[in-house]
Amino acid sequence: GCCSDPRCKHEC
């Protein structure tokens, strides 16, 4: 998921 991915974590 995005919240676990440093590349898009800022979207959470």
Curated annotation (Swiss-Prot):
Disulfide bonds: C2-C8, C3-C12
Keyword Secreted among UniProt keywords: yes
GO molecular function: acetylcholine receptor inhibitor activity; ion channel regulator activity; toxin activity
Protein location: Secreted
Keywords: Acetylcholine receptor inhibiting toxin, Amidation, Disulfide bond, Ion channel impairing toxin, Neurotoxin, Postsynaptic neurotoxin, Secreted, Toxin
Keyword match Secreted: yes
Modified residues (Cysteine amide): C12
Top-level lineage group: Eukaryota
Predominant subcellular localization, coarse grouping: secreted
CC terms in the record's Gene Ontology section: extracellular region; host cell postsynaptic membrane
Organ and tissue specificity: Expressed by the venom duct.
Known function: Alpha-conotoxins act on postsynaptic membranes, they bind to the nicotinic acetylcholine receptors (nAChR) and thus inhibit them.
Record note on domains: The cysteine framework is I (CC-C-C). Alpha4/3 pattern.
Family: Belongs to the conotoxin A superfamily.
Record's protein name: Alpha-conotoxin-like Reg1d
